Amino acid sequence: VADHGPVLLTSADGTAFSAYRALPAEPSGRNMVILPDIRGLHPFYAALAQRFAEAGFRTVAIDYFGRTAGTGSRDDGFDWQQHIPKVTPGNVAADVAAAVALLDRGPTFSVGFCFGGGHSWRLAAGELDLAGSIGFYGRPAMIADVLPDLRRPLLMLVAGADQATPRDEFEGLDRRLSELGKDHEMTIYDGAPHSFFDRSYAQWKDACADAWRRILDFTARHAG
């Protein structure tokens, strides 16, 4: 990793928000924007940004809560529950746009987790010129209203034993996307719980390794 550390970004509405940037020593030409889970810019996502940089990605992980909680990283003591209901898809898209503007030109992908997974998928229907959108265990309901508008490839990495969303909802989403002719891939990890990649990595090493490989393959294939 050539460089990494916290940065302060400004969204389109003038809001300052926290982010974490990691730059590769050997760039692949690809960019990644990380959308965290409900905890916001938890230290896990700073470490993940560095991991993407090690794989050649210019990477920025964003925080959601600049408008309601100010700036700074979010450790385990952060009370995200009072802030998460105030986060809107429009604000997330604007914040991601500010993150993209920080990166060099090149194919840019989003990857999100839980709450961020759904928002990452939604970006595939938005105005940002992304090469693809990746999401771990996002809720299908978060993208139900934009399915016809999806224009960019999706990678969906699903926990087979997700406590938040029954498996049949993901299977229904997979069928609906196929009916609409949308470019998507869905992998369901049997038995894996919600947050298996970001909170249960040690117990689900094989699933996490497979998901990482799929991300690298997906981004290589869609980098253009």
What are these regions (language model features)?
Residues V1-G224:
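N-terminal cap/leader regions of alpha/beta-hydrolase-fold enzymes
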